[in-house]
Swiss-Prot record:
Its EC number is 3.1.1.84. It consists of three domains: domain 1 contains the active site; domains 2 and 3 are involved in substrate recognition. Domain 1 contains the GxSxxG motif found in most members of the alpha/beta hydrolase superfamily. GO terms for cellular component: cytoplasm. This is Cocaine esterase. It catalyses: cocaine + H2O = ecgonine methyl ester + benzoate + H(+). Homodimer. The protein aggregates upon heat inactivation. Induction: Positively induced by cocaine. Pathway: Alkaloid degradation; cocaine degradation. It comes from Rhodococcus sp. (strain MB1 Bresler). Is relatively unstable at physiological temperatures since it displays a half-life of 13 minutes in rat plasma at 37 degrees Celsius. Keywords: Cytoplasm, Hydrolase, Serine esterase.
Amino acid sequence: MVDGNYSVASNVMVPMRDGVRLAVDLYRPDADGPVPVLLVRNPYDKFDVFAWSTQSTNWLEFVRDGYAVVIQDTRGLFASEGEFVPHVDDEADAEDTLSWILEQAWCDGNVGMFGVSYLGVTQWQAAVSGVGGLKAIAPSMASADLYRAPWYGPGGALSVEALLGWSALIGTGLITSRSDARPEDAADFVQLAAILNDVAGAASVTPLAEQPLLGRLIPWVIDQVVDHPDNDESWQSISLFERLGGLATPALITAGWYDGFVGESLRTFVAVKDNADARLVVGPWSHSNLTGRNADRKFGIAATYPIQEATTMHKAFFDRHLRGETDALAGVPKVRLFVMGIDEWRDETDWPLPDTAYTPFYLGGSGAANTSTGGGTLSTSISGTESADTYLYDPADPVPSLGGTLLFHNGDNGPADQRPIHDRDDVLCYSTEVLTDPVEVTGTVSARLFVSSSAVDTDFTAKLVDVFPDGRAIALCDGIVRMRYRETLVNPTLIEAGEIYEVAIDMLATSNVFLPGHRIMVQVSSSNFPKYDRNSNTGGVIAREQLEEMCTAVNRIHRGPEHPSHIVLPIIKR
């Protein structure tokens, strides 16, 4: 029996296999016997529980309802011992922590996990460790392939904004974790705060690999991430994705259309859904905003994911899999999506949607597509004549990131108006005619472009945009391909200047109804900064080059019957 009261034990030290002790706080209900347990592994300070938990659940309700909650500082941070090296020790530490919990008299042998972002990644690491008592996980906005998200991406470009912003945040935690203050701590803290306040400025420093503060505080940032642009063995050794195929651990996966992890959240759902009770919730959210309210686009009160709703969903999921309450998820859909445009939630039976019609929309035009007032067109018919749109990509003047799946760029993520970049000559715009009927796009989006460049390496970007009758051009999803990685992320190969290549761009996913009076637009360019690092166009080691060593590229998008550049939209007709 549980009466709603609970006790707290702080800084209980849990031994790992190498003798390092990790600190946990125990929130235990006043119960007559052992209870199910929920574990959170947190690199952001377990004492600051309500700051990060507002993005997930009101977990104290779990405790009041009879669950014990264990919150742990990950290795090397705050009250835990050891050295913090991102991701490297987390699987073993999760396994050891779970084993310790299962040995405690107050645990009934059933453990679950929940949490957002890094806290979600630690759940996948725990799940693949194979500890039998882990009965369910609820990773929100997380990844099982850390190369593809958050540090690089499916196109091979460095997610420099995410890397520098997150590293600066972790750096502040490392400083405050120290038991003995150092003379340089105050100045270091101020510099880290400056990075967080101006990530674009920090990303503009060249060579990018010369980040003395981050390199000193978190050598992993340079040694593992920046200096390993290929998806090599060092990345594959910490990737979990290939191990998910046989995973039977039930998973409640939460994602956001404007979150940098959305592609990997959806990919992990597909990977585990056949062997486990996998549930998926996707809203119009970014990594730091679950309200559905943004400066350029408001989705209404229905888009807000209130803590209570998330808590209720999580509790039902854990009741089913930790307590064996078979009816706890009765009436709960396998997939729940927020469909933008009509701004409504919709229940689905699967992802991808079974009735998806993947439809090519071809780039065309009566003239040059440069700027939004150019002659670029978008239609389901291939243009009858061959043509090419040309622009200059200058790394010293990259196209600025406007909204989208940014993580730390001063909160400017989410559905942003793209009009501020429409007058740039290096932004090609291809638009449909004004729509007379609604067009629903729900699913993964990709582009197949025929491109050439004067450089031996460069980038190409593609962005899907909803153009409103009032002129707003709201971005929905986007992607990038680094030409050296056009064939494989493992073995880069440069291109021949002037030769035409067909490339695929993974633009992640969205769910949006383009309403009558709107237009569908595709924007193509060669940079999206600081979301991604700038390609130097030299074919060299980009992170080790000075800005003065970089060069301007003449880039072309070829279109027509011989080179049918197009975007593939997942059309839903109902």
